[in-house]
Amino acid sequence: MQVLPPGSTGGPSRLFILRPVATTLLMAAILLAGIIGYRFLPVAALPEVDYPTIQVVTLYPGASPDVMTSAVTAPLERQFGQMSGLKQMSSQSSGGASVVTLQFQLTLPLDVAEQEVQAAINADTNLLPSDLPNPPIYSKVNPADPPIMTLAVTSNAMPMTQVEDMVETRVAQKISQVSGVGLVTLAGGQRPAVRVKLNAQAIAALGLTSETVRTAITGANVNSAKGSLDGPERAVTLSANDQMQSADEYRKLIIAYQNGAPVRLGDVATVEQGAENSWLGAWANQAPAIVMNVQRQPGANIIATADSIRQMLPQLTESLPKSVKVTVLSDRTTNIRASVRDTQFELMLAIALVVMIIYLFLRNIPATIIPGVAVPLSLIGTFAVMVFLDFSINNLTLMALTIATGFVVDDAIVVIENISRYIEKGEKPLAAALKGAGEIGFTIISLTFSLIAVLIPLLFMGDIVGRLFREFAVTLAVAILISAVVSLTLTPMMCARMLSQQSLRKQNRFSRACERMFDRVIASYGRGLAKVLNHPWLTLSVAFATLLLSVMLWIVIPKGFFPVQDNGIIQGTLQAPQSSSYASMAQRQRQVAERILQDPAVQSLTTFVGVDGANPTLNSARLQINLKPLDARDDRVQQVISRLQTAVATIPGVALYLQPTQDLTIDTQVSRTQYQFTLQATTLDALSHWVPKLQNALQSLPQLSEVSSDWQDRGLAAWVNVDRDSASRLGISMADVDNALYNAFGQRLISTIYTQANQYRVVLEHNTASTPGLAALETIRLTSRDGGTVPLSAIARIEQRFAPLSINHLDQFPVTTFSFNVPEGYSLGDAVQAILDTEKTLALPADITTQFQGSTLAFQAALGSTVWLIVAAVVAMYIVLGVLYESFIHPITILSTLPTAGVGALLALIIAGSELDIIAIIGIILLIGIVKKNAIMMINFALAAEREQGMSPRDAIFQACLLRFRPILMTTLAALLGALPLMLSTGVGAELRRPLGIAMVGGLLVSQVLTLFTTPVIYLLFDRLSLYVKSRFPRHKEEA
């Protein structure tokens, strides 16, 4: 077998060495394509990996959670459950609101999912309540995805109802039209309306009921077609004063006559301009506000979307009165841009460090310029390919390019070092370039394809993690491939034109000192290697111990999913007792806001109270805390969270749950804390039995903190127990009872006011100021068969009970979600294992199922596939090396270096206090590709020496180790310095980059020392083994 091509021909590099102009123009084309491509690449935090997600919201004011579940959510779920491509369906039914979240398979286009959802809603129309104020509204948005931008609209001169009306018609609609915007929500609920507050005593004294008033109002305010008159010469359109537009007009409405005298609405009710829902409120830095949350569509370019919004904001705000102020409270793209800038700086620093190492070893400016050109050319050329693949400039692709800095320079170094060796021996530069490039060409190809083989398994990772790292793997592979092309074309051509004996031998004092140092190091290495080769079994024992240590460290190291990022935004949930009213929650949020705004790291705060589809219950409030930029505060987000929770802990009757927002959102619902675990049953009764038991057990685990659940079954409910026989005798139906209660206490939307710009509601309710609580039920009167009025108490008893505040479903079955954080000193892997052990201890029945959700579920899937991923990388590399070497043995020798990389990486992570997460695992897989380079360079030269010079295997491997020591050391240090800026990263997004750098630097440091000694010993071991096999099983040639 001929491993290396003839050294004097130049191999694949010959044509490019002899045609410098063509080579230069080809490289210039690659450079130009990359520069143009860079300008077209979008900027993002991470690759787009969102599941196609659609949220369907139905509002039914006054309906209880039970009614919302049975009348609205269940019919919708049955229709949605028939859709193809649906991955998961979750729903939350609370007082007056139903929210169904549909998550589809990654392969299903969002537009197709949208059509399916619209068709399902249309098919379900006849099954939904006839008096729904509005049909179900769907939006292409993941509710768990934090808004890309939050704006607060305030005014010190106008009521919030007018402010919301202007914002909705002049601002929100325009922002909704921006490409990439999925949903614009107005938190604060101050939509203008005419509110009619009935005086129960007044209408009772007149013998009227709330139903009489409702009928009168709906009949007096209509907006329908009236036709037209078409005469011989003229056509006349018919119109009438059938609409009432203001509270004044409604106040004057005659609703009945008593003894011939008119009874006007103002006589029995307070009629005023107000808000459609008086139990909603939002505050920005404690000031009443309308808060606009802008959410993107799954898959949309967040940077482009935010830029478009900012460009149109000045024009939109000009259309508002001067007393209305629009403030951008948060913009996620600010941190995304800062993170990308920091990563770009680290990329530039890595290039500078790599070039510095090259100069330190070569000590020659022309020799340093050559790889100094090859590195940026390989990286810039990658941008052209990224454009065609629809990639983006994001943290992962920039990390890939930063790591590639150390990879791509390796090829150039190997070529330059080999050509320089021949020039120093007296060869002419052109002949040396042809001979050196031809001799090293196969090594370059081996290094390239074996390294790309390591990345192949990343391309086949499933689900969202696979999508996430596909851009990383492909970007790195493309950079490596372009580097190999550059190293076999441009690099030897430049060596032939720029290097000479004079330039290489020209030395100053620094050069001579470095040369003496390297000579001493190589001599020391030679003496050490000779001793190691004389004691092979001791070296093999060290190699075997390294393998065992790798396995042990893999078992004991804390495991996580994805680094927790500091993006400068904290999401919060404020929880109060289940019987809390809107007024008490508004008071509590004011107390909490005051404490939060006192923290020096907090820049702004928005809070929201009320049920609107996004916030499920009245006893909870949502918060968004925007921190100052990272360079303007002393603490990271986790320290700020701890400090805020301590500050709020002294406020009685509230629990505050906080979590930092993340760029990677896998969940489908807003959770109180970072991780979720669900308990599902076939009935609510089964859930109510097991939820307290499991929650108590989880709260006792030291591996979990801030454990809570969304199970709330202790809300106060007034049960109206109607005596049906008595009601029937009086001619009162259950529909009459429901209507009376709804008219009084449901903020019932009974009529619509149409204007040229918008539509507004008329809201009917009882004025309960003088009769609060259950006493208000005593004022309800119903119309009997004889036309008289009957108090509700005549046919019903009122009982106070407990009832759920919300009912949650997962795939149509009742479910409870437990939320938890992981305390310091424990990992997500520890928490997951503790929960699984608790499940076994409790011995849950067969009809109770549990499942991790969101990032915890993704962690389980990723952890289960990690070992197979590494095995697949090793197998892929073995296959490629076996094909290249036409040998079963030599690839094993090369792969024997891998355990050293694992030991170094795992030890470095443990010392640094980092978890073994997905980012660190990618670093270990990349180490597999880097570390085997040392063995490839040694073995290639040893095989050549055996074949061409007739040397013994021991002498050949000894000479190869000494000859390749300098390029091995140079390439390893280049790769190490390429990863060093990531390890030392401190800026925005550093949490994401640091584990990769730590794993690679640690792995390279340990493997560099060990592989220089273990590889030659293992090479000789397998050589002896090969000879033994050949002697025992000789191959007999058949004669023709």
UniProtKB/Swiss-Prot annotation:
Which protein family is it in? Belongs to the resistance-nodulation-cell division (RND) (TC 2.A.6) family. MdtB subfamily.
Q: How does it sit in the membrane?
A: Multi-pass membrane protein
Q: Which PANTHER family match?
A: MULTIDRUG RESISTANCE PROTEIN MDTB, PTHR32063
Identify the SUPFAM superfamilies for this entry: Multidrug efflux transporter AcrB pore domain, PN1, PN2, PC1 and PC2 subdomains, Multidrug efflux transporter AcrB TolC docking domain, DN and DC subdomains, Multidrug efflux transporter AcrB transmembrane domain
Among Gene3D superfamilies, the record links this protein to:
Multidrug efflux transporter AcrB pore domain, Multidrug efflux transporter AcrB pore domain like, Multidrug efflux transporter AcrB TolC docking domain, DN and DC subdomains, Multidrug efflux transporter AcrB transmembrane domain
Its subunit composition reads:
Part of a tripartite efflux system composed of MdtA, MdtB and MdtC. MdtB forms a heteromultimer with MdtC.
Any Pfam family from its record, for instance, is ACR_tran
Q: Which UniProt keywords apply?
A: Cell inner membrane, Cell membrane, Membrane, Transmembrane, Transmembrane helix, Transport
List localization entries: Cell inner membrane
Q: Does the keyword Transmembrane helix apply?
A: yes
Gene Ontology molecular function terms on file: xenobiotic transmembrane transporter activity
The record's annotation in InterPro entries points to:
AcrB_DN_DC_subdom, Acrflvin-R, Multidrug-R_MdtB
Q: What organism is the protein native to?
A: Salmonella gallinarum (strain 287/91 / NCTC 13346)
Q: Please give the name of this protein.
A: Multidrug resistance protein MdtB
Identify the GO cellular component terms for this protein.
plasma membrane
Chain segments annotated as transmembrane: 25-45, 347-367, 369-389, 396-416, 440-460, 472-492, 537-557, 863-883, 888-908, 910-930, 968-988, 998-1018
